[in-house]
């Protein structure tokens, strides 16, 4: 139980996963018997993390969110203000997407993110979606705020 509580990938950002899955991972049972090399899958998440870091670093300067609180912002039309706010807030959200992407990459690199094999178009594909910190695209395109709980840290 202590190893579950102090597993390094939970301490990073607190990505949620079940004890049952962790126990199967430690005991190398079920889908964890023969884990393939996770290098490429984890590097994809690292690349995503670095892209989000770049968006945060550069995007915040190009489209400053602070402009939304200036007196000049009220002079624009309502549709312009809505679109500007959404675009300007994305680099701030990328600040949070970045560590969750890095943690997901670390979990996949450890092998814990392996979810077995899925057949796609008569071809077997390894699935690395057992533990995902954030589905950023789904979070950006949801209709209801309640849906965030499905795509972030679950």
Protein language model regions, located:
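Helix-loop boundary elements of multi-pass alpha-helical membrane proteins
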Residues: 22-46, 137-141, 145
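Membrane-interfacial catalytic/cofactor-binding modules of polytopic membrane enzymes
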Residues: 1-5, 71-154
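Long, well-ordered, tryptophan-enriched scaffold segments
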Residues: 35-64, 79, 83-88
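Transmembrane-helix bundle segments that line or gate the permeation/cavity pathway
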Residues: 1-22, 27, 60-64
């Amino acid at each position: 139980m202590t190893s579950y509580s102090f597993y390094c990938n939970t301490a990073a950002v607190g990505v949620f996963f079940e004890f049952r899955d962790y126990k199967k991972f430690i005991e190398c049972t079920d889908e964890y018997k023969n884990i393939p090399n996770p290098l490429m899958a984890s590097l994809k998440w690292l690349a995503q993390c670095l892209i989000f870091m770049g968006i945060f670093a550069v995007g915040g300067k190009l489209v400053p969110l602070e402009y939304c609180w200036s007196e000049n912002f009220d002079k624009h039309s309502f549709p312009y203000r809505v679109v500007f706010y959404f675009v300007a807030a994305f680099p701030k959200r990328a600040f949070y997407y970045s560590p969750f992407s890095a943690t997901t990459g670390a979990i996949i690199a450890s092998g814990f993110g392996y979810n077995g094999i899925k057949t796609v178009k008569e071809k077997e594909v390894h699935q690395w979606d057992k533990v995902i910190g954030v589905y950023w695209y789904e979070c950006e395109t949801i209709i209801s705020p309640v849906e965030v709980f499905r795509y972030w840290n679950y």
